[in-house]
């Protein structure tokens, strides 16, 4: 019985978080009641899982960042050459960023758990960029902290390209990953 209750609680938390992402993306000031309605749950159920709006925002931040970590690890970056790994990680991360667009693009609560997950994301990214540098994809004297910042900016900008909403194919994570990696490694200069 306890296991069924736990599974039910996990499902309702997941439904609340997914509904919160959708609702808050449309209206950042949405109420807990609106989120509950979108999740198909009562307001009391939402409040049972999250004491207040801040607790819900904190859970959103942790959930989205955990999904980024999972996406990076799913790409198995150590099992392929740096270029292949960078492409896989980028495509996976773009999928998560598209799904959690509100949470990952807004300043969310920086709990200890969210901060630890962000440190893990940074560590994975720096490890991958270090491998890319060792394999000659990045200049030997490239500043990897700056390169990491540029990479993160490219990820965000790829999802927010002007006119992308008119061309759904342009939002395909595989297409965007190619764009991000090509821009990161070659900039806007000639490719020859």
Label for each model-derived stretch:
Residues 59, 70-98, 109-114:
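Hydrophobic alpha-helical connector segments
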Residues 9, 61, 65, 114-122:
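Amphipathic, non-transmembrane alpha-helical scaffold segments
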Residues 40-50:
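Short hydrophobic/aromatic patch on the recognition helix
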Residues 1-38, 55-58, 63:
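Basic, helix-initiating cap at the start of DNA-binding domains
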Residues 84, 116-117, 134-151, 171-176:
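All-alpha amphipathic helical-bundle segments outside canonical DNA-binding/catalytic cores
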Residues 55, 95-127, 137:
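Short secondary-structure transition hinges
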Residues 19-26, 67-78, 96, 150-161:
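Solvent-exposed, amphipathic alpha-helical segments
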Residues 88, 123, 127-135, 153, ...:
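C-terminal peripheral helix-coil segments that are non-catalytic and often amphipathic
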């Amino acid at each position: 019985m306890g296991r069924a209750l736990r599974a039910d609680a996990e499902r309702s938390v997941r439904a609340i978080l997914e509904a919160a992402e959708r609702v808050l993306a449309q209206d950042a000031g949405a109420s807990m009641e609106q989120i509950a309605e979108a999740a198909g749950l009562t307001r009391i159920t939402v409040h049972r899982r999250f004491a207040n709006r801040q607790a819900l925002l904190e859970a959103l931040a942790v959930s989205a960042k955990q999904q980024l970590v999972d996406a990076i690890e799913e790409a198995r970056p150590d099992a392929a050459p740096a270029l292949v790994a960078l492409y896989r990680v980028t495509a996976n991360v773009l999928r998560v960023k598209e799904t959690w667009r509100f949470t990952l693009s807004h300043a969310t609560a920086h709990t200890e758990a969210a901060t630890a997950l962000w440190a893990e994301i940074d560590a994975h990214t720096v490890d991958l960029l270090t491998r890319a540098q060792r394999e000659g994809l990045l200049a030997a004297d490239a500043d990897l902290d700056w390169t990491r910042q540029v990479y993160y900016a490219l990820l965000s900008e790829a999802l927010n390209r002007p006119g992308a909403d008119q061309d759904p194919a342009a939002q395909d994570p595989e297409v965007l990953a190619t764009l991000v990696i090509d821009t990161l490694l070659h900039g806007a200069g000639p490719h020859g």
